[in-house]
């Protein structure tokens, strides 16, 4: 997913 765009990693 867009992990780099979020302020936290979606697990």
UniProtKB/Swiss-Prot annotation:
Main subcellular location of this protein, as a coarse class: secreted
Single biological process term from Gene Ontology: neuropeptide signaling pathway
Keywords for this protein: Amidation, Neuropeptide, Secreted
Positions bearing Leucine amide: 11
The keyword Secreted appears for this protein: yes
Cysteine-cysteine disulfides: none
A GO-annotated cellular component: extracellular region
Subcellular location: Secreted
Highest taxon in the source lineage: Eukaryota
Protein family (similarity comment): Belongs to the periviscerokinin family.
Task performed by this protein: Mediates visceral muscle contractile activity (myotropic activity).
Protein name as catalogued: CAPA-Periviscerokinin-1
Source organism per UniProt: Austrophasma gansbaaiense
Taxon lineage: Eukaryota, Metazoa, Ecdysozoa, Arthropoda, Hexapoda
